[in-house]
A protein has these predicted regions:
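Thiamine diphosphate
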Residues: 1-147
Length: 147
């Protein structure tokens, strides 16, 4: 069985090889979201923002506004809690087409403690205009969503 994360990165890398407008943005989470191969093979299409989720969302919005197809990736807890204002204003209200890949929602990062738990991500994001939330159950659904 193929994990959803592997399906995501395999599909994204395959598409990005053919489309230079596809950009992956992350926040010191290339290992968590399995973007190491993407970063090595397509460094010109990869942006590492460090531990700066607000900046990653803002950069992603700017890239999308310029016509790029942006996937911003990292732990779900940080894109909902730490950068909520940027997601609301820079993505939702501004209608910038950025895909947020939030990994390890809920308490999946149990060992890292409450700072890494994301119990409210779906509840909060569904209130924003134009925000679509999907939770693929397997590699096949993940691949279709990325495509």
């Amino acid at each position: 069985m193929i994990a959803c994360r592997k399906s995501f990165t395999d599909t994204l890398l395959s598409l990005a090889r053919m489309d230079k407008d596809i950009i992956a943005v992350t926040t010191d989470a290339r290992g968590s979201v399995t973007l190491n191969d993407f970063a090595k093979e397509l460094p010109q299409q990869f942006v590492e923002c460090g531990i700066a989720e607000q900046d990653a969302v803002g950069i992603s919005a700017g890239l999308a506004h310029s016509g790029k197809k942006v996937f911003v990736c990292g732990p779900a807890c940080f894109y909902v809690a730490r950068s909520l204002e940027q997601v609301k204003v820079d993505l939702a209200y501004s209608q910038n087409n950025v895909k947020i890949l939030g990994v390890s929602g809920g308490v999946a990062y149990g060992a890292l403690g409450a700072t890494h738990h994301s119990l409210h991500d779906i509840a909060v994001l569904r209130t924003f205009p134009g925000m679509n939330i999907v939770l693929p159950c397997d590699a096949r659904q993940t691949k279709k969503l990325v495509e």
